[in-house]
């Protein structure tokens, strides 16, 4: 057997993205949750201390600073290798009043408000579809609804949780006044987002007391349908209906319809999930505990089991996932190794990799109002460049390089233009006698120049003689086309026909026609011999028409 090629290529290096962050928010206290405003450049973060911060960022200022730092680094480096440099803005959240007081709003980051919102850590953050209100839940099981721009609490409630579990996930309906929360014991509660009153409850959704890892909307089925992920299963249910009747059914009863539809056991923890296109809802992707993405298709098997797997990172976990929302069949997923992967679900492979941190895992992913990726860990949040911004940056660099090359070549072009003017003056003085020559190409092509001059002179002499001997008006169109065809036939015929009288020319043409008609008759006889039988003609396709080589000559009665 031949030896296998063991050349190893690091796929991460090949797929490493050229996109950079435009902003990095650093936290000295552990970060537990983040949420991005759907319509403005606002990001809200919740910490383990119970504090909630609301910041506004200026994309134009941050992008300009990034470009300036990159240019400055290139000019200062002078081709020398150096350590990794952060070109983007780094903003310390906790020490902002000390370290960033002199920069103010010019830094591109502005603190809108901060407050001690909960006793204990902030567990969940959710925003309205228009970004007017923000909902937060802490380990104190207190739900608060506040205005995003002011931070003022407009309504709050104490969520009764008899089993003592803490809330792990909260989702706000994009179209209706529904607020859905899941806890560590597999319980889902549905609240009215206006009154914060409970309207429905589902218990033990995932095989007992398994925690709710993720909840997202199943809009393709119904505006009230939602999907939850817990432990090793996927479930979907109606937010208006309780599942108490499911516990009265026999566990082995597979015919009765249940309120909660549960998938097969995946034998691995299902941590996060999303639809590739939430509006279409044809492909569902889940992040697994073993570093694999599983692809589900509701129309194929009603979410009973996965249909495809995409390998992301071996011996790692996929902790968070969001769609790109760019109509490219791709999703972003955050991994425990600190990388962000862009996976093409249609191709079934990773197409781009970005590094969030070499020391921390990626716990949160979100998209800002302009579909930029936001990644978060325990100590920092990064807002990344979009692909359009990177392409515009490359175009600007190319235009600058072109302008530099043009400015460098101005002196050369001026000297060349002066020399060209001198040459033009010399050629004008020498070329006055040759100005009447048409199509003189001796300067362009030296080889064959004499032949081209002789041919052109013969053509011009022939045209002059023809115009003197016979007027152009007396020539017939058919005879003109016939002469063209005869000229294309053979060189010997051209030598014989030149200088013949009208009668001799007609006689020569008649002889050619007789010979061609005899040849056509012989071809027809051969064709009849080779004609297929009637039985075989049924199986034949259309036959191309035979080529007619009669030079287009039909009649000479009028000559």
Curated annotation (Swiss-Prot):
Where is the region Disordered? Answer: 386-500, 515-559
**Protein's cellular compartments:** Nucleus, Nucleolus
Q: Does the keyword Membrane apply?
A: no
Write the protein's name. WD repeat-containing protein JIP5
Output the Pfam families linked to this UniProt entry: WD40
Q: Which organism is it from?
A: Vanderwaltozyma polyspora (strain ATCC 22028 / DSM 70294 / BCRC 21397 / CBS 2163 / NBRC 10782 / NRRL Y-8283 / UCD 57-17) (Kluyveromyces polysporus)
Q: Acidic residues bias: where? A: 391-417, 482-494
Query: Would you name any one GO CC term?
Result: nucleolus
Q: Where are the WD repeats?
A: 26-67, 77-116, 117-156, 162-201, 207-247, 265-306, 313-347, 354-394, 428-470
Q: Where is the composition biased (Basic residues)?
A: 535-544
**Major location (coarse):** nucleus
Q: InterPro entries, from UniProt?
A: WD40/YVTN_repeat-like_dom_sf (IPR015943), WD40_repeat_dom_sf (IPR036322), WD40_rpt (IPR001680)
Q: Which gene encodes it?
A: JIP5
The entry sums up its family as follows:
Belongs to the WD repeat WDR55 family.
Q: What are the record keywords, sorted?
A: Nucleus, Repeat, WD repeat
């Amino acid at each position: 057997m031949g030896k296998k090629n063991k050349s190893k290529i690091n796929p991460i290096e090949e797929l490493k993205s050229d996109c950079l962050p435009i902003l990095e928010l650093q936290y000295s206290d552990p970060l537990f949750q983040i949420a991005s405003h759907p319509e403005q450049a606002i990001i809200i973060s919740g910490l383990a201390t119970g504090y909630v911060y609301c910041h506004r960022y200026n994309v134009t200022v941050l992008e300009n600073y990034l470009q300036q730092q990159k240019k400055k680094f290139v000019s200062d480096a002078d081709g020398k290798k150096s350590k990794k440099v952060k070109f983007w803005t780094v903003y310390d959240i906790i020490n902002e009043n000390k370290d960033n007081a002199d920069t103010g709003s010019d830094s591109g980051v502005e603190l809108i408000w901060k407050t001690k919102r909960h006793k204990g850590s902030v567990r969940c953050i959710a925003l309205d579809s228009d970004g007017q209100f923000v909902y937060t839940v802490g380990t104190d099981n207190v739900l608060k609804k506040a205005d995003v721009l002011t931070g003022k609490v407009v309504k709050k409630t104490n969520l009764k949780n008899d089993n003592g579990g803490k809330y792990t996930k909260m989702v706000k309906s994009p179209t209706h006044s529904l607020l859905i929360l899941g806890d560590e014991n597999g319980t889902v509660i549905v609240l009215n987002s206006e009154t914060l009153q409970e309207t429905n409850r589902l218990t033990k959704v995932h095989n007992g007391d398994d925690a709710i890892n993720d909840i997202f909307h199943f809009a393709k089925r119904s505006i009230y349908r939602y999907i939850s992920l817990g432990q090793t299963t996927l479930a979907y249910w109606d937010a208006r209906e309780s599942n108490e009747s499911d516990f009265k059914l026999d566990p082995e009863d597979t015919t009765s319809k249940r309120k909660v539809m549960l998938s097969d056991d995946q034998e691995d923890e299902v941590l996060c999930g999303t639809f590739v296109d939430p509006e279409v809802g044809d492909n569902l992707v889940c992040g697994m505990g073993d570093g694999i993405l599983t692809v589900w298709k509701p129309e194929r098997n009603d979410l009973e089991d996965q249909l495809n797997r995409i390998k992301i990172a071996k011996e790692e976990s996929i902790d968070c996932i969001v769609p790109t929302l760019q109509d490219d069949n791709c999703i972003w997923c955050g991994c425990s190794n600190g990388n962000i992967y862009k996976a093409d679900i249609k191709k079934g492979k990773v197409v781009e990799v970005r590094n969030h941190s070499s020391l921390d895992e990626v716990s949160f992913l979100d998209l800002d109002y302009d579909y930029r990726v936001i990644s978060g860990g325990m100590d920092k949040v990064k807002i990344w460049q979009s692909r359009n911004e990177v392409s515009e940056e490359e175009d600007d660099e190319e235009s600058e390089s072109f302008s530099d090359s043009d400015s460098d070549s101005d002196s050369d072009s001026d000297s060349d233009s002066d020399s060209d003017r001198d040459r033009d003056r010399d050629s004008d003085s020498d070329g006055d006698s040759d100005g009447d020559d048409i199509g003189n190409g001796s300067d362009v092509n030296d080889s064959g120049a004499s032949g081209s001059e002789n041919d052109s002179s013969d053509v011009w002499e022939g045209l002059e003689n023809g115009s003197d001997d016979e007027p152009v008006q007396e020539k017939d169109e058919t005879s003109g086309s016939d002469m063209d065809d005869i000229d294309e036939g053979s060189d010997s015929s051209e030598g014989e026909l030149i200088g013949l009288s009208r009668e001799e020319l007609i006689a020569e043409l008649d002889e050619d026609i007789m010979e061609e008609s005899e040849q056509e008759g012989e071809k027809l006889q051969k064709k009849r011999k080779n004609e297929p039988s009637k039985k075989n003609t049924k199986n034949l396709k259309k036959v191309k028409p035979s080529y007619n080589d009669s030079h287009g000559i039909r009649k000479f009665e009028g000559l």
